[in-house]
């Protein structure tokens, strides 16, 4: 007999012994209890009998209840380990409720819209780190120190070249030093080109992008001037080094502006915890497009800030035409005179076609504006955003824009008549809450401090005179300014001269006066001033606040309210209900939702557009004038007037108005 058969026989005997035994509940509990056995205390027979009666009196056991003392012995049988149970799992396909409800045409999305500020902030930070912050650190590694040193050295080259040119024109250079003078000027021109080598490389890179910019034209100018300089060494003629060095200096200055602008914009974006957008929406008020506010996206800025502006595109077209004109005049000079004269004419024509200030006409106005926008945490979304914020627009204003939280305070309360003061407060709060506006929270706090209640208002209406009215418990109630109550026939006691106060009248009798203090903040005042300074901007009051009348705003902020609009209540309600559409164009992003940031974005954009367009137009005109002058002198053969001194003076003459135009954005 094997060992396995012996083990099977022993297990069978043990199983039969277990089946033959009867187990009580107490035995089972004792078997599985961890507590040590305690000494059994003698109990009287009466208590045992009472427990026996209570046990017999237990309620009937329901079908879903199992009594341990009634366990069937068959349940205690052990299941062989080698027995395998098969369990079939049926896969349940989820029901597409939305599709089912759509077929029945009775689906209603009952799931609530959950606002997850943390997830939005996390997504915003992820985009900011991948875009603006990464770009900011790349620019920080490049820095602006080398550019500043190059600009200073280039200015020194300009001064030395201009001084040497002046000595030559005054006849203070001896003939035996002429070759040294010419070689020195030619060497200075090469040094200037070395200082602006990155600008020249940018001009070549622009060709690969299918752009012919001023830097590309500067590369051609360098090549032609170098060839002309070789002829100058043979003819002992001074090359136009001063004019070329001045152009290189201004090109370096333009690159410095572009880098500081981008660093400032990226710094503003990377510090954002929330972005607010200013977008242009068509047909907002009286046919004017409106500048509405909404949630901003990082892509609104990153996708547009590097795109060429309208003036820059015009500059590229002009640069190509200027090159063709210069080549044509050079060929004409070579045909009419000789090869040396042809290169001389081409060189001076290229210099005259692009005045030095042309290189900063688009960058410097934005650099000046960016310093102010950076302080108020605002960025413009490229030239597309500048165009969106320009033109004749309507700018909506609300109570929170003029008086942010905490700017309006209760200065005092005075009651008149025999009516209960708590009733007066309750009536006033009920009416103001129905009307809405910036005074709701203030009066609700006053009502809560008095443990008051709100009453239902009937026949509520707004009055154009500066107040609201309605019926509460069958009594007519008026709330508004002092002039409003006087116009409504309410008698005001003599001696009351509080203008900034809310007056309450019940049944034609003055019952209360709530004096208010409106704090004028510097940022709000500057924002209102810049908005009202432009005729093309119409500031529209959209809030239902009877205190914000035209006379009150004029006296409080000292602005020209004739450029503001105070529409009827029905129109204000329609304006408040308007939202951004798919046709809205984002013009600017700001991290602070205050009036100063939004107002300067709008007015700054239109100043920038004016400065860039005016500057580009003026420099194109100056270049055309220079090309025409070179053509006339070439035809007349007056090569004696094409001197380096005259070319440098020509650059300086157009530098003054061009520089002044770039200051336009300081007037914002």
Residue locations for each model-derived region?
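Intrinsically disordered, low-complexity acidic segments enriched in Asp/Glu and Pro
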Residues: 1-106
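Signature of the cytosolic headpiece of P-type E1-E2 ATPases
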Residues: 148, 181, 231, 449-552
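Core alpha-helical transmembrane segments of integral membrane proteins
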Residues: 145-202, 631-647
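ATP-binding catalytic core of ATPases
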Residues: 417-465
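Conserved ATP-binding TGD loop and adjacent catalytic N/P-domain core of P-type ATPases
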Residues: 286-289, 472-475, 506-645
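Hydrophobic alpha-helical transmembrane segments
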Residues: 188-199, 228-231, 244-273, 280-394, ...
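Cytosolic-side membrane-insertion boundary helix
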Residues: 124-153, 308-310, 600-621
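Asp-based phosphoryl-transfer active-site loop
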Residues: 385-413
């Amino acid at each position: 007999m094997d060992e396995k058969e012996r083990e099977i026989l022993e297990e069978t005997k043990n199983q039969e012994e277990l089946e033959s035994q009867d187990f009580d509940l107490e035995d089972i509990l004792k078997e599985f209890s961890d507590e040590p056995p305690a000494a059994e205390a003698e109990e009287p027979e009466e208590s045992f009998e009472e427990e026996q009666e209570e046990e017999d009196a237990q309620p009937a056991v329901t079908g879903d209840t199992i009594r341990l003392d009634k366990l069937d012995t068959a349940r205690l049988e052990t299941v062989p380990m080698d027995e395998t149970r098969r369990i079939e799992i049926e896969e349940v396909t989820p029901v597409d409720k939305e599709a089912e409800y759509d077929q029945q045409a009775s689906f209603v999305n009952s799931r609530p819209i959950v606002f997850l500020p943390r997830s939005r902030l996390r997504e915003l930070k992820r985009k900011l780190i991948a875009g603006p912050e990464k770009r900011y650190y790349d620019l920080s590694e490049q820095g602006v120190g080398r550019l500043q040193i190059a600009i200073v050295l280039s200015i020194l080259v300009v001064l030395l070249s201009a001084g040497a040119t002046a000595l030559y024109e005054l006849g203070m250079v001896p003939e035996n030093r002429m070759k040294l003078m010419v070689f020195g000027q030619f060497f200075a021109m090469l040094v200037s080109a070395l200082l602006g080598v990155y600008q020249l490389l940018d001009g070549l890179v622009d060709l690969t992008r299918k752009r012919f910019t001023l830097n590309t034209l500067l590369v051609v100018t360098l090549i032609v001037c170098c060839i002309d300089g070789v002829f100058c060494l043979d003819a002992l003629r001074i090359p136009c080094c001063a004019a070329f060095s001045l152009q290189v200096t201004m090109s370096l200055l333009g690159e410095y502006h572009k880098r500081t602008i981008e660093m400032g914009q990226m710094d503003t974006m990377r510090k954002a915890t929330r972005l607010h957008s200013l977008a242009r929406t068509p047909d907002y008020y009286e046919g004017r497009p409106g500048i509405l506010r909404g949630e901003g996206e990082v892509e609104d800025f990153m996708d547009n800030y590097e795109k060429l502006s309208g003036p820059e595109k015009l500059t590229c077209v002009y640069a190509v035409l200027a090159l063709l004109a210069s080549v044509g005049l050079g060929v004409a000079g070579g045909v009419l005179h000789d090869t040396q004269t042809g290169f001389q004419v081409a060189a001076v024509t290229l210099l005259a076609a692009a005045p030095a200030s042309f290189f900063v006409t688009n960058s410097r106005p934005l650099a000046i504006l960016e310093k102010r926008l950076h302080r108020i945490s605002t960025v413009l979304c490229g030239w597309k955003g500048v165009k969106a914020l320009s033109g004749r627009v309507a700018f909506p204003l609300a109570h929170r824009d003029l008086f942010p939280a905490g700017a309006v305070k209760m200065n005092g309360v005075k009651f008149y008549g025999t009516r209960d003061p708590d009733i007066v407060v309750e009536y006033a709060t009920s009416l103001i809450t129905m009307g809405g506006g910036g005074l709701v929270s203030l009066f609700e706090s006053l009502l809560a401090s008095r443990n008051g209640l709100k009453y239902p208002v009937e026949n509520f209406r707004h009055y154009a005179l500066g107040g609201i009215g309605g019926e509460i418990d069958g009594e007519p109630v008026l709330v508004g300014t002092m002039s409003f109550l006087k116009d409504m026939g309410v008698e005001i006691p003599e001696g009351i001269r509080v203008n900034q106060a809310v007056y309450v009248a019940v049944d034609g009798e003055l019952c209360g006066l709530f004096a208010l203090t409106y704090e004028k903040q510097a940022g709000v005042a500057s924002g209102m001033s810049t908005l009202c300074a432009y005729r093309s901007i119409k500031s529209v009051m959209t809030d239902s606040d009877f205190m914000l009348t035209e006379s009150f705003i004029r006296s409080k902020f000292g602005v020209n309210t004739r450029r503001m609009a105070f529409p009827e209540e029905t129109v204000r309600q329609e304006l408040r209900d308007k939202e951004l559409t798919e046709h809205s164009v984002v013009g600017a992003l700001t991290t602070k939702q205050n009036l100063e940031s939004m107002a300067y974005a709008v007015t700054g954009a239109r100043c920038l557009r004016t400065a860039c367009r005016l500057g580009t137009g003026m420099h194109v005109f100056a270049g055309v004038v220079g090309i025409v002058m070179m053509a006339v002198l070439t035809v007349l053969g007056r090569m004696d007037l094409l001197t380096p001194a005259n070319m440098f003076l020509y650059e300086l003459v157009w530098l003054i108005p061009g520089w002044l135009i770039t200051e336009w954005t300081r007037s914002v």
